[in-house]
């Protein structure tokens, strides 16, 4: 299948598959996934029907933050393979009509990057101004900004007596985008990969690149209001876009930290001057009571619907968003919002339908398409994620939370929940590796695995395959406006998508009991066609505006004008 480089809007009907390479497939016995492992599974991804693969970082890195600390933008981490392996992946994916999107981190580099190593301890280094250095204030840090990973965001360079800024780990030094030389380096890096044939880029925390230049302390927060969606961020993105993205026809998705709808309308504006689309995470905080992640709490269903409505109506005709539940930082959605025991298959399908029928570009995270669950670890020794082990130390040893309570919280909230190895088959270690996996495989792999899913036409896999097909076949999914039909209903999430010719209804029961609802009379359900549902005998129930839905049932109905 040939792919034209400048088919500008291919991503509007596309579905993108996210691969976290470390946990996807090991081609040998080292216990960590690699590029050759990805190549070996391309036929599986072709069968699923995805249009593109987004790879989390595979660059040279000390791996302090899972590769988001890049020490060489022009090299592949030997843990994942060689540049030759990468070129093979690119060629074989393209042959199957699958595009490749690379994850690029340009807010910061690893402190092992040669730019930083040259800058460290030498105020006269040509690379000193590639980073953000400040003198102490009153013998201490330049301001009170906090790192996203805890603690102060400044680290002292003893040799020069100045501090450098790190919004993430101290091993991740923020780049100084005010320096035009930095922006030229970024253009060169992106051009290098685009020249190879890489089709697009996911830009990590890209809305943090412009800092308020007086670097004020924050008397009411952690400092984020002074660097989030900062003063020159749109100018910088337009500069990079014009120089590189527009030249190559790259698809671009910006990860937006703590952003607003208004900024995202501009980042992803339909004139294409900045980015193709944006990721935001507001809907994944509905189980953070008062913004607190590390608690066991039910999710706020009404708030979830309100957030979807805000972003769907706000981006319609103005911008473009990514649609997703899962990634390498979030727990498995079927464990989080569904029922991963009694109704695992039903709830996995319902949750998929409820985001895939919205406007935007859906992202499927590895294993989501087979209904993989959180692993339910019971010992802290099973965890590898630094955020999780740090929080265990703080909450158990400092705050007095019991071991049992903290294990229950981690079992719900840890990032390792989504990083367990991909479950390929029912053989040892789920067919992920011939060695010992870097992170323990979830115990349910003999039941939940790709081989079993592909063999069962009623599996979660084929439901995802159908959702991916529908986006290409039904125009209203791409261009229809969005309306939440039952915003106050405590159990049902039901919305309409409408254009001049079609009305699509997506009706979802988010709970484990039978629930009824009445849809507005203006929708003529007697004319509706049942496009897809997750129960075998839903067709007869379609014709009435009075709907009765079984546990975790979803119905996707189409009315042609």
Where are these regions (language model features)?
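Conserved catalytic-core segments centered on acid/base and nucleophilic motifs
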Residues: 190-194, 198-201, 354-357
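Active-site rim elements
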Residues: 176-177, 183, 227, 333-346, ...
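Hydrophobic residues within beta-strands of alpha/beta enzymes
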Residues: 53, 201-203
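Carbohydrate-interacting/catalytic domains
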Residues: 1-60, 87, 91-93, 361-364, ...
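Acidic/aromatic-lined carbohydrate-recognition and catalytic surfaces
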Residues: 2-191, 195, 208-262, 270, ...
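Short acidic (Asp/Glu) and glycine-rich catalytic loops that position anionic groups and cofactors
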Residues: 219-220, 286-288, 329-332, 440-448
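Hydrophobic "anchor" residues on beta-strands that sit immediately upstream
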Residues: 99, 103, 200, 251, ...
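Conserved alpha/beta catalytic core and glycan-binding cleft of carbohydrate-active enzymes
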Residues: 111-144, 148, 237, 241-421, ...
